[in-house]
Amino acid sequence: MGVPRPQPWALGLLLFLLPGSLGAESHLSLLYHLTAVSSPAPGTPAFWVSGWLGPQQYLSYNSLRGEAEPCGAWVWENQVSWYWEKETTDLRIKEKLFLEAFKALGGKGPYTLQGLLGCELGPDNTSVPTAKFALNGEEFMNFDLKQGTWGGDWPEALAISQRWQQQDKAANKELTFLLFSCPHRLREHLERGRGNLEWKEPPSMRLKARPSSPGFSVLTCSAFSFYPPELQLRFLRNGLAAGTGQGDFGPNSDGSFHASSSLTVKSGDEHHYCCIVQHAGLAQPLRVELESPAKSSVLVVGIVIGVLLLTAAAVGGALLWRRMRSGLPAPWISLRGDDTGVLLPTPGEAQDADLKDVNVIPATA
């Protein structure tokens, strides 16, 4: 079968559908979403991974950084010291396998290879493994637990399987991970950080206006750094529903989410509007008033001060580096949470809402 060109929207849809019974309603699943591209854009990773515990992202990795790092509330999980080193080692092996697959496919690309690997604990505490793969947005291969190898109907599946079989004990490592390592990790996470599954972070909100076409302005209601991802935004005019605008939604590198909704109104009428936000982290719906120009000026001053503080921090970092090179101990340890990889969506469904006057931000990007 021929291989179609990559369709980014299809890739996201595929990984939304693949989990099956491992939906967001279950908090007892551990899933790794792996993606590799044969022709990455300059400055972007060729391979990246997001790890999910139930509906929450707990891990990120990409080939530029080369280290597995915790996300969201899992940054504070009381894990054993070697845990993240083990995650890093395993994902570097996966990175090598995925990039080797492109050699087996030849140079006809571009190709996008994705994998969904993990396990779910059933009611009787037994583990149900998942190991499926997609090429350019179409599922084409899985890992057969009985045969202990990869297989599929496409010739590309045979080519990749043969290539991976040549790697040192790759099939045995895959089998061991699915049947033993994955359920063990899942049980450890549930034991050490079950409270993190109830993590709720309320959004920081802002409502701003900017000029649009002659005689009109655009109101933008923005929500920052919230979790869980389900969120409702709606506009009111003098207390009455004002319809919905154009929405935007996406994940942050720390496991939280951001969203916004924009509405076009008549110039001079902006002060009649407000934004209402509903979220699990809020005790009640929050009313967000239009930000005044004076407040915006204060924000600009704050940004300038922030830049100055970052500059000072950079100078301090240079001094710290020199201190460490000279053999002196470091006075602190800093956690880094950047991620240049594109995060894949979590399985789940959006919260129901009245679409006539509510802008619903879905649980999947």
Swiss-Prot record:
Ig-like C1-type domain: residues covered: 202-289
Extracellular side: 24-297
Keyword check for Cell wall biogenesis/degradation: no
Compartment(s) where it occurs, according to its Swiss-Prot or TrEMBL record: Cell membrane; Endosome membrane
One GO biological process term: immune response
Annotated segments matching region Alpha-2: 111-200
GO molecular function terms noted in the UniProt entry: beta-2-microglobulin binding; IgG binding
Residues the record lists as Phosphoserine modifications: S334
Signal peptide limits: 1-23
Spans annotated as Alpha-3: 201-290
Known tissue expression: Expressed in full-term placenta, heart, lung, liver, muscle, kidney, pancreas, and both fetal and adult small intestine.
PROSITE patterns: IG_LIKE, IG_MHC
Cytoplasmic topology ranges: 322-365
Location of the region described as Alpha-1 in the Swiss-Prot/TrEMBL record: 24-110
Sugar-bearing residue positions: N125
Stretch list, region Connecting peptide: 291-297
Segments traversing the membrane: 298-321
Matches recorded under Pfam families: C1-set, MHC_I
This protein's UniProt keywords: Cell membrane, Disulfide bond, Endosome, Glycoprotein, IgG-binding protein, Immunoglobulin domain, Membrane, Phosphoprotein, Receptor, Signal, Transmembrane, Transmembrane helix
InterPro entries reported in the protein's UniProt record: Ig-like_dom, Ig-like_dom_sf, Ig-like_fold, Ig/MHC_CS, Ig_C1-set, MHC_class-I_related, MHC_I-like_Ag-recog, MHC_I-like_Ag-recog_sf
Bilayer topology term: Single-pass type I membrane protein
PANTHER family: IGG RECEPTOR FCRN LARGE SUBUNIT P51, MHC CLASS I-RELATED
Subunit and interaction comment: FcRn complex consists of two subunits: p51, and p14 which is equivalent to beta-2-microglobulin. It forms an MHC class I-like heterodimer. Interacts with albumin/ALB; this interaction regulates ALB homeostasis. (Microbial infection) Interacts with Echovirus 6, Echovirus 11 and Echovirus 30 capsid protein VP1.
Recorded family membership: Belongs to the immunoglobulin superfamily.
Known role: Cell surface receptor that transfers passive humoral immunity from the mother to the newborn. Binds to the Fc region of monomeric immunoglobulin gamma and mediates its selective uptake from milk. IgG in the milk is bound at the apical surface of the intestinal epithelium. The resultant FcRn-IgG complexes are transcytosed across the intestinal epithelium and IgG is released from FcRn into blood or tissue fluids. Throughout life, contributes to effective humoral immunity by recycling IgG and extending its half-life in the circulation.
UniProt protein name: IgG receptor FcRn large subunit p51
Record organism: Homo sapiens (Human)
